[in-house]
Structures are given as structure tokens and as C-alpha cells.
Amino acid sequence: MAFSGKYEFESEKNYDEFMKRLGLPGDVIERGRNFKIITEVQQDGQDFTWSQSYSGGNIMSNKFTIGKECEMQTMGGKKFKATVKMEGGKVVAEFPNYHQTSEVVGDKLVEISTIGDVTYERVSKRLA
């Protein structure tokens, strides 16, 4: 499957500006900058399990089926309902405060999150 794999954080753009726009306090933004994030994606057709492990042992995991409403949670643990879509090979989700697209480009997982005119990009390299 196109998305299945384990990915390790490699680089990011506009982290500070995006996190400030989310309303996170400075100390939380600073701590998050040093996180080593491992993303693991399991894809079975239209069904996904998308997990992110953060330094310190915190894990966020969302299960969803493309085109069907599901309950998801944000990095902060807030639960919300969303319908995840597939558009042009990209997984597209509307989080409560931002729009996110994810795609695999070569051996990289590229995640783009947008709030208004601020775009955050996180790139992770495939480990397995």
C-alpha cells in the first residue's frame, strides 16, 4: 500500500508560527521542538491506522476509513468527528483548527497543515 510504513521525523518548516497560531504557550512550543516523532501508518485498502509516537512515550493514534465519518483526536487529546478523504493520492483531514494533507513522495511522508495563511510542513523519512 502507498502509505503503509514507519517514518522518522526529518525536517519541518514554520513550526513556531503554526504552533503560535494554534494558541499553544511558548513553553509547550519549545518542548515540542525537540520531539523525535515516529509515525506509523497501516493501510488496508481504504482503512487506516495512523499513529504518532513522541519523545517521552506519548502516542496518538487515529483509525479511519476514507470517506466515512469517524472520531479522531488531536495531539492535545481533543476528540472530534471528521470525514477523512483521499484527493489526488493525498490523505486530507479537517482538524478543529486546521486543514491537513499527507502524501508519500518517494521515501518521505510529507504532512502539510494550514491555518489561514500559515502553512506548517513536516517531512519524515521511511524507516520500514
UniProtKB/Swiss-Prot annotation:
Post-translational modification N-acetylalanine, affected residues: 2
Localization of this protein: Cytoplasm; Membrane
PROSITE patterns registered for this protein in UniProt: FABP
Gene Ontology terms: cellular component: cytoplasm; membrane
Membrane topology: Peripheral membrane protein
GO molecular function, a single term: lipid binding
Highest taxon of the lineage: Eukaryota
Family matches, as Pfam families: Lipocalin_7 (PF14651)
Principal cellular location given in the protein's record: cytoplasm
Keyword match Cytoplasm: yes
Annotated tissue distribution: Expressed in ovary granulosa and luteal cells.
Alphabetized Gene3D superfamilies for the sequence: 2.40.128.20
GO biological process assignments: bile acid metabolic process; lipid transport
Keywords carried by this UniProt record: Acetylation, Cytoplasm, Lipid transport, Lipid-binding, Membrane, Transport
UniProt similarity note: Belongs to the calycin superfamily. Fatty-acid binding protein (FABP) family.
Biological role: Binds to bile acids and is involved in enterohepatic bile acid metabolism. Required for efficient apical to basolateral transport of conjugated bile acids in ileal enterocytes. Stimulates gastric acid and pepsinogen secretion.
Domain characteristics, as noted in the entry: Forms a beta-barrel structure that accommodates hydrophobic ligands in its interior. Can bind at least two ligands per molecule, however, the stoichiometry is debated.
The name this protein goes by in its record: Gastrotropin
Species of provenance: Mus musculus (Mouse)
